[in-house]
């Protein structure tokens, strides 16, 4: 029995033994996913103006000259700027949090995370909301005083594509070799010996460099803070090109800003989610957070930048209300779960135990109160509704802005299944009792 099998036999963490197909699949993702983002870039920001059909016709007709003319160029100074952006966010992540002193109910400062499968407890400096505010104040002031243009991101978006890909792969290889040579928490490592699987899915659970947890940092700081700045740059570029900002652009920015601010306001809650509490840090997170997130999650604003859509008042209100309903479901479910962890008075739950790899039995509870008694993943249901609202704001002329809600639905359904497999291993008979009490995953009576 190899070390990986030995480790997984007593651990409720990741225990999948990859097959040849798994290794080939992860190898394909590792090598070809950047080209998917490049295609998104060409269709959304090139002369195709969001038309997948026109792009497809150029491929069929062999018009490679037109396609090639839309491929962005690489600029070394843009790579330097992207690296400085990450360093700047790293500096902000090290500052002590002060926002919790002024913002009601906000939890900031040094806080404990989730107990890892090997029994380690990691602490995080929760100051994302502070970093978000400082960054936006500095960027807005810099634009106001003319230090750089408010369209600077979109003016260099093509070069940024190449730069963040380089950075994403550099971080991936750093994480891989760090895990092999000086792991922060070796007992939580999952090394399978399958090269691409280990690189893509990650070996280390909580890699730290200079006291900073790379998983939380890259999950939240460079990409999600940039998300809103990218949207704002798209809006300013739309204004520059057309002389106004469409109400559809405003709607997308508002709905996504609500989601972004919610993420940072509830960063202390986020450290207990799947991304932080269960996933290992490899290419999937390193490249995903530096490339997939900023380019995939901003497709709506990018599409509207070149295709201004003026929504009717009725449709605007309908999409806005839909987005708010989705957000309320998402936030209420997560709030209830977080609240019930600390105060179980009047809460319906199944008391249970689980064992970590160090052999200790630990107490926990499976809650079926509130929305968690309606379905097992109502937070995901709300997330999908909100994601769909972003896309509906872009009208119905082209499919490309709808990629996001399709992707999020697939992501959250597969994540739901992974969650439940993990919970079944972790809680055993208690999980079976829970699924009998709450039989539906997303939508009561349907699924």
UniProtKB/Swiss-Prot annotation:
EC identifiers of the protein: 1.3.1.21
Localization (cell): Membrane
Entry keyword set: Cholesterol biosynthesis, Cholesterol metabolism, Lipid biosynthesis, Lipid metabolism, Membrane, NADP, Oxidoreductase, Steroid biosynthesis, Steroid metabolism, Sterol biosynthesis, Sterol metabolism, Transmembrane, Transmembrane helix
Pfam families per record: ERG4_ERG24
Gene Ontology CC: one annotated term: membrane
Predominant place of localization: membrane
Catalysis performed (reactions): cholesterol + NADP(+) = 7-dehydrocholesterol + NADPH + H(+)
Parts of the chain that traverse the membrane: 24-44, 71-91, 102-124, 133-153, 157-177, 244-264, 281-301, 309-329, 393-413
Record-linked InterPro entries: ERG24_DHCR-like
Entry binding sites for NADP(+): 337, 341, 367, 372, 379-380, 419, 423-427, 434
Pathway: Steroid biosynthesis; cholesterol biosynthesis
Enzyme class label: oxidoreductase
Membrane protein topology class: Multi-pass membrane protein
GO molecular function: 7-dehydrocholesterol reductase activity; NADP binding
GO biological process: brassinosteroid biosynthetic process; cholesterol biosynthetic process
Task of the protein: Catalyzes the last step of the cholesterol synthesis pathway, which transforms cholesta-5,7-dien-3beta-ol (7-dehydrocholesterol,7-DHC) into cholesterol by reducing the C7-C8 double bond of its sterol core.
Homology family: Belongs to the ERG4/ERG24 family.
Protein name: Probable 7-dehydrocholesterol reductase
Species this chain originates from: Acanthamoeba polyphaga mimivirus (APMV)
Gene: DHCR7
